[in-house]
């Protein structure tokens, strides 16, 4: 597997496709460029999903996230683009991407984008676990 930025997301078979289970990931070092100023934007991305038949492979996810480092994107655009790419690669039952951008001009921006597979309904009372953030960048 390469160790340079890549737009390719690799997957592996869900080990328990008959069960809904929650996968939680944090990407505390996401960077892209502001399309207006060219200055770097930094964010912590929080990915929560319930896989269907495939799970995203972690190293490919890291290299995919790294591929945005030199690209200009508005916060709302990049969050939705990443979600769309992850959904296209994994076809999850449910996926939520939360992007917590660091302060810019005195304003923190959080963008939350969600996908729900057509026809999928969670079992009654599915509460997604709240994980303590491991990043020291923002609470």
Swiss-Prot record:
Biological function: Catalyzes the NADPH-dependent reduction of 7-cyano-7-deazaguanine (preQ0) to 7-aminomethyl-7-deazaguanine (preQ1).
Protein's recorded name: NADPH-dependent 7-cyano-7-deazaguanine reductase
Family: Belongs to the GTP cyclohydrolase I family. QueF type 1 subfamily.
CC terms in the record's Gene Ontology section: cytoplasm
Pathway(s) it belongs to: tRNA modification; tRNA-queuosine biosynthesis
Gene Ontology MF terms: preQ1 synthase activity
Subcellular location: Cytoplasm
Pfam families hit by this protein: QueF (PF14489)
Main location: cytoplasm
Recorded catalytic activity of this chain's protein: 7-aminomethyl-7-carbaguanine + 2 NADP(+) = 7-cyano-7-deazaguanine + 2 NADPH + 3 H(+)
EC identifiers of the protein: 1.7.1.13
Broadest EC class assigned to this enzyme: oxidoreductase
Positions annotated to bind substrate: 56-58, 75-76
Alphabetically ordered keywords of this record: Cytoplasm, NADP, Oxidoreductase, Queuosine biosynthesis
Gene3D superfamilies: 3.30.1130.10
Annotated active site: 34, 41
GO biological process: queuosine biosynthetic process; tRNA modification
């Amino acid at each position: 597997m390469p160790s340079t930025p890549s737009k390719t997301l690799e997957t592996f078979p869900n080990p328990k496709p008959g069960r809904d289970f929650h996968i939680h990931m944090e990407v505390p070092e996401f960077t892209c460029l502001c399309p207006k100023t060219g200055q770097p934007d930094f964010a912590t991305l929080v990915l929560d999903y319930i896989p269907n038949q495939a799970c995203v492979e972690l190293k490919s996810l890291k290299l995919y996230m790294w591929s945005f480092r030199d690209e200009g994107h508005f916060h709302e655009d990049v969050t939705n683009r990443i979600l769309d790419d992850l959904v296209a690669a994994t076809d999850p039952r449910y996926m939520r991407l939360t992007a917590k951008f660091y302060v810019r001009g005195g304003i923190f921006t959080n963008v939350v984008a969600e996908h729900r597979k057509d026809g999928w309904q969670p079992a009654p009372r599915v509460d997604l676990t709240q994980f303590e953030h491991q990043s020291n960048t923002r609470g």
